[in-house]
Amino acid sequence: LSKGFKVSYSGVCKYIKEVKNKNIPSSQEAFIRGYHPPGESCEFDWGEVKLYIGGKQQRFYMAVFTFSHSNGRYAWLFRHQNTLAFMESHRNFFREVGGAPSMMVYDNMRVAIKEFVGAEKKPTEALLRLSNFYRCHYRFCNARAGWEKGHVERSVEYVRRKAFSVRLRFDSLEDAQNQL
């Protein structure tokens, strides 16, 4: 008003009607890039890979760890995606990097989540033991919220492509693991 504009109730109503007719959302989601200090946070996920071991095609599961700060990636191959493989992969990773990060981030995997109670997720006994032994915390991502754990989602595909795009045939699982 102080700059000479004329504002009326009917003019404001007309403007609101035009905006609604254009189907312009009143608010849009915004994402803030997270910062994680080095070694503080690591994301975990499983991925599948089909390899030929001794001439026979087999399916393996890759346990992939990705540091949130550096995108440093580590992976191990397993025949099963079960609790034993989950715990063994963590032991391998923590030995490899010389300790455990402060926070491990998981999606909604059965080996980490025992049950859902409303929006809350209860950890499995294996995850509780792992967390207590290595003195690291854990966090679960929300369902269908890939931005909460985006590093490792891309890392599974990255590791699979870089490690196994040229060579798919190995004499043993150990040979395939060495390729990683």
Spans of model-derived segments:
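Short, basic interhelical loop/turn and adjoining N-cap
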Residues: 2-14
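Secondary-structure transition/capping motifs at alpha-helix termini
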Residues: 3-6, 22-23, 93-102, 133-137
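Short, polar/flexible loop-turn hinges at active-site or ligand-entry regions and domain interfaces
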Residues: 5-7, 79, 120, 164-173
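Mobile-element integrase/transposase regions
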Residues: 10, 17-73, 81-88
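Active-site beta-loop-alpha junctions of metal-dependent nucleic acid enzymes
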Residues: 75-103
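Acidic/histidine-rich, metal-coordinating catalytic segments
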Residues: 100-119
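Two-metal-ion acidic nuclease core segments, chiefly of the RNase H-like superfamily
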Residues: 119-138
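Charged alpha-helix within mobile-element recombinases
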Residues: 135-180
